[in-house]
């Protein structure tokens, strides 16, 4: 794969890198950076691709991304993905509860 993908949009570059990646050779942040795509841009594009239904999975150790190659790979990732979402929702609830508790203390 060419280092610099000239004439392509950032999304096209991310799609190309993901298409050539797998669990043993994921698309890494270094690959994105070699193609002038920042970490935040890569994450945003990957989020948009996921929202569009593309099965972009990530390694446990945050080494990189690739397209799920089978149902088991996708299910394994989605289990972790959903667990993270549940943890974030619980944390958000605690933050909200803490805020209102502190507001009540101020008003008392």
Predicted region positions:
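Short amphipathic alpha-helical interaction segments
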Residues: 37-48
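Long, low-complexity, charge-rich intrinsically disordered regions
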Residues: 77-108
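Short acidic, hydrophobic short linear motifs in intrinsically disordered regions
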Residues: 22-34
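Short His/Asp/Glu-rich catalytic/ion-coordination signatures at enzyme active sites or charged loops
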Residues: 69-77
